Every structure is written in structure tokens, then in C-alpha cells.
Swiss-Prot record:
Keywords per UniProt: Chaperone, Plasmid, Virulence
UniProt-listed InterPro entries: Invas_SpaK
Domain of life: Bacteria
Function: Required for surface presentation of invasion plasmid antigens. Chaperone specialized in the storage of effectors within the bacterial cytoplasm, maintaining them in a secretion-competent state, and allowing their immediate delivery to target cells upon contact of the bacterium with the host cells.
Name the record gives this protein: Surface presentation of antigens protein SpaK
Oligomer and partners: Homodimer.
UniProt record similarity statement: Belongs to the SpaK family.
């Protein structure tokens, strides 16, 4: 897995999605790569323990909102995400945010076209969570 060129993978996937080269700034594989979005939290991409991880931080909802949204959140969490090592997205909570996270299977991190599909599917999950919250 250490042979992954994360910068090139992300760059290729962004070109595949249709991002103009002029808006893709210098990418650095020594820290998380952040894809800023207009109306959603940023998508972060990094190598963690030699595995590609994607995550997005949402503002932490109140306990009441979280409880009232539990059914919809559970449905989101149980949706198949076939690119993930456990075929699911994960949700982690802190005082400051809810983090939607996925660790990608090694088979899918060598092709920009496939990684573009992963980014798109992850973004769709972000949209669902954003609507629920």
C-alpha cells in the first residue's frame, strides 16, 4: 500500500470529475489533502496507517437533534459502501463535530477514475447526513 501516490490519485480524480486545473492548488501528500466545497464541509483525504481515508467534519448537533435523527442516521450508516474496508461509512462524534469517515480498500486506490467514483459516492453520503442534521 505504501506505493500510493495520493497527490496524483486525487489530482487525476478531480480532473475526471471535471475540476479545472486552475482551481486545483498545490497538493501535499505529507498532510491531509482538503477538497473545499461551497455548501458542504470539506472532504479530507490522507494516508492513515498506509490506508487511504476520507472524512468530513459536520458541526455537532444537539443531543435532542441527534436523538430525533437517529433512525435516519442509522439508515445512512447501514447503506453499503462497497469501496470501504468494512463496506460501510463510519460516524465518529466529538464535542465539536460529527465526523463521517471511510477507509478505502487497497484495490481502489490506484485509478483516478475509480477514485472519482469513490469521491462522488462519499459526497452523496455527506448530502444525506447534511439533510438529516
Amino acid at each position: 500500500m505504501s506505493n500510493i501516490n495520493l497527490v496524483q490519485l486525487v489530482r487525476d480524480s478531480l480532473f475526471t470529475i471535471g475540476c479545472p486545473p486552475s482551481i486545483i492548488t498545490d497538493l501535499d501528500s505529507h498532510s491531509a489533502i482538503t477538497i473545499s466545497l461551497d455548501s458542504m464541509p470539506a472532504i479530507n483525504i490522507a494516508l492513515v496507517n498506509e490506508q487511504v481515508m476520507l472524512w468530513a467534519n459536520f458541526d455537532a448537533p444537539s443531543d435532542v437533534k441527534l436523538q430525533s435523527s437517529a433512525y435516519n442516521i442509522l439508515n445512512l450508516m447501514l447503506m453499503n459502501f462497497s469501496y470501504s474496508i468494512n463496506e460501510l461509512v463510519e460516524l465518529h462524534r466529538s464535542d465539536e463535530y460529527l465526523q463521517l469517515r471511510v477507509v478505502i480498500k487497497d484495490d481502489y486506490v490506484h485509478d483516478g477514475i475509480v477514485f472519482a467514483e469513490i469521491l462522488h459516492e462519499f459526497y452523496q453520503r455527506m448530502e444525506i447526513l447534511n439533510e438529516v442534521l
